[in-house]
Each structure stands twice: as C-alpha cells, then as structure tokens.
Amino acid sequence: MFLSVVACFKNESHILEEWIDHYQKQGVDQFLLCDNNSTDDYQSILDKYDNIILHKDSSAQIQWGTEFPRGKYGDGIYSKLLTEHKTEWAIICDPDEFMYAREGYDTIRQFLEERGSEFNQLIVPNILFHHKPGTDIEIKEQPESVVDTFIYASRMDKNVKSIVKVDSITKLRVHEHAVEGRSTRPNLKDDFVLTEGTANSKYGCLPIVPKGGYKGSAPGGAKGNMW
C-alpha cells in the first residue's frame, strides 16, 4: 500500500463514516484501526468499507508502550499495526482530526507522490474548530456533519500530527515520530532532526502561518490540520 491512516478509537461511531470518507477522498488506501473497547455500534459503519483492518483490544484499556510487545517501530498498538500491515506512508491521527491537502494539490496522496522524496516526515500543526464564535458554547446534539458544522477556527494549537514514511521510523510517538532523515513542516522550509531522545514539546510551539494567512472560518472538523 502507498498511504494508510492509523488510529485508535473508543465510542466514536458518530464520526467514523465522515472521517473515513474524508481520508478516502484524500487518496488513502487502507485504514489500520484499533477498537479500544467501544460499546457503540461502530461495526455497522466499518462494514460499509472493504479497506478496513481492525484490531480489537482485549485489555481494559490500551496502554502506550506496554500493551503490546516491541515491534519494528517501537512499542504499542501503532507499531503492531504497522509491522503487520505494510504501507509506504502513514497518517497517524484521531477520528476527530481531518487533514487536508496543501493548496495547489488535490489530495494528500498527490502531494506525497510529487514531493515525498524531499522528506521522511511532514509535521502538520493542529487548528481547533468550533460551531460558533467563542470556545465555551456547548453543542447539545451531535451534528450530521462535523466538517460542515465546526467552521470557526481558533488560534493554531501547539500540538501537531504527522505524515511519516514508515521505513524511516526509529520510534513511534503520538504526535511526531523519531525518524531517519528529514522532518519538515508543510512549507518544506523548516528542518528538524527528531531522534528517540528529542522532546515533543520542543517542536510543538513553532509558529507557521498557512498560505494565504488565517481566516475567521474555514472548512474543518473538531480539529483540522492546516497546511
């Protein structure tokens, strides 16, 4: 496979279909998913697709780094999934995170096919989205579409997620990963050396402005990864 999404979820059937459809439109080949003891009807959603690989966790709760034996890319469920199911590139994210292609490219896949030789990891900043201006307004019912409802962008969050070339990984993490070779932001100008001893927070606060600047509202989800 060329491009896969890797994620764990728990009781997120309300968003799974929109999330999977979004990434399929971005050129994703397969989804490597782990169910963390969900009690909702997620299976009826996943049954609609033929490119889902599902691991069901048998423990009380997934524990980072201890739940599964050490694999090729480190400890934990993500290493297990990526060791057993081959893919060239992986987007490791949560079901409330929607990543979009950079301006000038139709899909994330197209961007990786054309520019992927320039880096081994793309570190993408998070932006939180809300359904109305202000962060303290509660929403009473689950909207039909997260992307169409949460349209007001807040300031860029310090956290990031990554698109990573799997064969370059030396240690998997939650946000960005230790890799051999070049790690960069989506502008392809900022370089970082991320090793197993590097603290994540050192890189989480670096400012980056999306091409065209910030907008008061934009398509997004509960979280949107802006390029």
Regions found by a protein language model. Give the residues of each.
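Short acidic donor-binding/metal-coordinating loop in glycosyltransferase active sites
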Residues: 36, 94-98, 103
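Short, acidic, metal-binding catalytic loop of nucleotide-sugar glycosyltransferases
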Residues: 21-30
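Catalytic-site signature of metal-activated, phosphate-bearing donor transferases
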Residues: 67-72, 101-227
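Short beta-strand/loop segment that forms part of the nucleotide-sugar
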Residues: 29-37, 56-58
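Active-site-proximal specificity loops/subdomain of glycosyltransferases
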Residues: 43-92, 100-101
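N-proximal low-complexity "stem/linker" segments adjacent to membrane-targeting elements
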Residues: 1-21
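Ser/Thr-glycine-rich phosphate-binding loops at phosphate-binding pockets of nucleotides
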Residues: 7, 34-44
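Short acidic/polar active-site loop segments enriched in Thr and Asp
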Residues: 29-30, 88, 120
